[in-house]
Design a protein with these regions (language model features):
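NUDIX/MutT-family hydrolases
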Residues: 133, 144-175
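N-terminal strand-loop-strand
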Residues: 39-75
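Conserved Nudix-box catalytic region and its N-terminal flanking loop in Nudix hydrolases
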Residues: 60-101, 159
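Short, well-ordered beta-strand micro-motif
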Residues: 54, 135-137, 157
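Acidic, metal-coordinating catalytic segment for phosphate/diphosphate chemistry
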Residues: 13-51
Length: 209
């Protein structure tokens, strides 16, 4: 399955909450149906991107990066690359690359959508990132570090997040914590939630860029 086909299938089968999330799902689907190149970074003025919100196993801390160009705290994420085979794979690759963490337990189902304008992405002008967000767990205390795209990577308590964090980031964090809480079963790992059907991927599992 191509990356474009995977993105269409994931969004077609995803059940968003009513309101803005449902509207964004339709917006993203219309874009992909109209543009076979809709995931390419050269698709102007809109293209689909993917990201991941990383939480500690007890869900009380979130790992964020201080973006070098935007100078704001974000979840991890970015553009699709030629070697990517799925949207969840894009999110996982970006999460591993930008966090410096060796492995993440990824929920393969989208958790949140967001559309945002970016002024520094394309020399032709402002582009809109149609961002499909996933969520993952990483062990608290695991080694991490900033990539060339970030100024800092840091764990933040969910009740003491960076000042000025955007409303959509608060929505993403809340939605991700709710998703993991709902996934807890009697067969979950001791000490924290685990997805039924989720998977832990190491950096070595990812295609080269």
């Amino acid at each position: 399955m191509s990356l474009h086909a995977d993105a269409l299938a994931r969004l077609q089968h995803w059940q968003p909450s009513a309101g803005r999330q449902a509207e964004l799902r339709q917006r993203f689907l219309a874009h992909l149906l109209a543009r076979p190149d809709g995931l390419d970074r050269g698709c102007f003025p809109d293209h689909v991107t993917a990201g991941v919100l990383v939480l500690s196993p007890d869900l009380d801390q979130v790992l964020l990066n201080l973006h070098r160009k935007a100078r704001r705290w974000f979840a991890f994420g970015g553009h699709c690359e030629p070697g990517d085979r799925s949207l969840s794979g894009v999110a996982l690759r970006e999460g591993l690359e930008e966090s410096g963490v060796a492995s993440l337990e990824l929920d393969p189902v989208p958790v949140h959508l967001d559309e945002h304008a970016v002024d520094f992405c394309d020399p032709s002008g402002t582009v809109h990132h149609l961002d499909v967000r996933f969520t993952a767990l990483a062990e608290r205390g695991v080694a991490h570090g900033a990539s060339e795209e970030s100024l800092d990577v840091r764990w933040w308590p969910v009740d003491a997040l960076p000042p000025g964090l955007e409303a959509e980031m608060h929505e993403l964090i809340s939605a991700s914590r709710d998703r993991w809480r709902q996934s807890i079963t009697s067969s979950s790992q001791p000490g924290g939630p685990s997805l039924s059907g989720g998977s832990t991927w190491a950096a070595a599992d990812q295609p080269s860029r």
